[in-house]
Amino acid sequence: MTRGKVHSLESFGLVDGPGVRYVIFLQGCPMRCQYCHNPETWTTEGGSWWSAEELFRQAYRYKNYWKKKGQAHGGITVSGGEPLLQWEFVTELFTLAKEKKVHTALDTAGSIFGASRLPMEGFERLMEVTDLILLDLKEMNPQKHKKLTGMENAPILEMARWLSDHGKEMWVRHVVVPGLTDSREELLEMKAFLDSLKTVTRVELLPYHTMGRAKWENLGIPYVLDGVPTPTEEEMKEAEALVGIPLGTVFSGFLSVPSGNTEK
């Protein structure tokens, strides 16, 4: 029985996959994104331990919300932090879910793809029980990506290609930060990359916000994006046009923020 370190749980998520989702935020992330709104999930020191079996049992209590007439089928989404750090735990959890025909989604930045702590055999096993990957594509330029996140983007792009080649459905997300991730050149480069992938069924551009700033301050971490504004509606429309999102497409505009509730 595998145990995982869980930061918090959300029983009625509406933005992390199709339908109503039971969202599990895991503890631990190797990236240090300058606009991160969940910096308290970076280390493995917080959170609480759960077995995959007890966590699935907890999530399955909400199954009646997952199959509402006239709505997309919901299910379970595992987010972070970076869930690939706990791939064995997620694999066991998703295996239990698939035994009950529950839709599974993995919200990941893909930063450790190909690394020793994520064996390829283990990743492939995880993908066998994952229906949808929510891939956070942060920045196309390698140098800017390293400055923005502290890590290289080559593994992320490689993982996206692997997912495409192996027929795994992806929703791709990109946070639009004025002056950092919104240049015309880079958004066009992103569009070209996305056009090369065969299994991307949705692209979401999310406006940068400062909802997590208080968390940085509480943790004593300098907030390096102080003074950076939230993009305007017009700037978001321009970015969407460059990436190729059809006009009139409506997305939520924000990612989930863990509440700290573990429901235990």
Region roles according to the model:
Residues M1-L26, P30-G46, R61-G70, T262:
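N-terminal [4Fe-4S]-dependent radical SAM core
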Residues M1-V15, V176-K264:
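Auxiliary Fe-S-binding modules of radical SAM enzymes
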Residues M31, Y35, M151, T199-V200, ...:
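Short, well-ordered coil loops that connect the C-terminus of an alpha-helix to the N-terminus
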Residues E40-T44, K146-E152, G220-V228:
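Short glycine-enriched, charge-decorated loop/helix-capping segments at active-site entrances
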Residues Y60-G75, L84-M211, E217-N218:
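Conserved AdoMet/S-adenosylmethionine-binding subsite of the radical SAM
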